[in-house]
Amino acid sequence: MWSRLVWLGLRAPLGGRQGFTSKADPQGSGRITAAVIEHLERLALVDFGSREAVARLEKAIAFADRLRAVDTDGVEPMESVLEDRCLYLRSDNVVEGNCADELLQNSHRVVEEYFVAPPGNISLPKLDEQEPFPHS
């Protein structure tokens, strides 16, 4: 899954049908180049500043490569992880109401009626330091 997600994220900027492993090490050892790390940092907004973080990423890619090697031909996709049980859906009762203001009060940070989530492990600037978003 990781390798597929990384490959999909890298496919367009790197020029088409090149796979992720071709941009790492040609032998597929899981080693990652500095250019790929910089690209992933921009895409995921995650800082890979330490060797430990890069090693963790390499382990995740190696695990994804092992998963890719699993032969799934002829295996039907599962609808549920609990195949021996029936999953009952609750009745969905729609309740109309304009409660956006109440919902936004539950958030620690709000910008122009949107929730603000911290991007990965890079801390957000303080609200006073942020520039307002341009209106389109």
Swiss-Prot record:
It catalyses: L-glutamyl-tRNA(Gln) + L-glutamine + ATP + H2O = L-glutaminyl-tRNA(Gln) + L-glutamate + ADP + phosphate + H(+). InterPro entries: Asp/Glu-ADT_sf_sub_c, GatC. Its EC number is 6.3.5.-. SUPFAM superfamilies: Glu-tRNAGln amidotransferase C subunit (SSF141000). It is found in: Mitochondrion. The keyword Ligase applies. Allows the formation of correctly charged Gln-tRNA(Gln) through the transamidation of misacylated Glu-tRNA(Gln) in the mitochondria. The reaction takes place in the presence of glutamine and ATP through an activated gamma-phospho-Glu-tRNA(Gln). It is linked to Combined oxidative phosphorylation deficiency 42: An autosomal recessive mitochondrial disorder characterized by onset in the first months of life, cardiomyopathy, respiratory insufficiency, lactic acidosis, anemia, and variable impairment of mitochondrial respiratory complexes I, III, and IV. Death occurs in infancy. Subunit of the heterotrimeric GatCAB amidotransferase (AdT) complex, composed of A (QRSL1), B (GATB) and C (GATC) subunits. This is Glutamyl-tRNA(Gln) amidotransferase subunit C, mitochondrial. The gene is GATC.
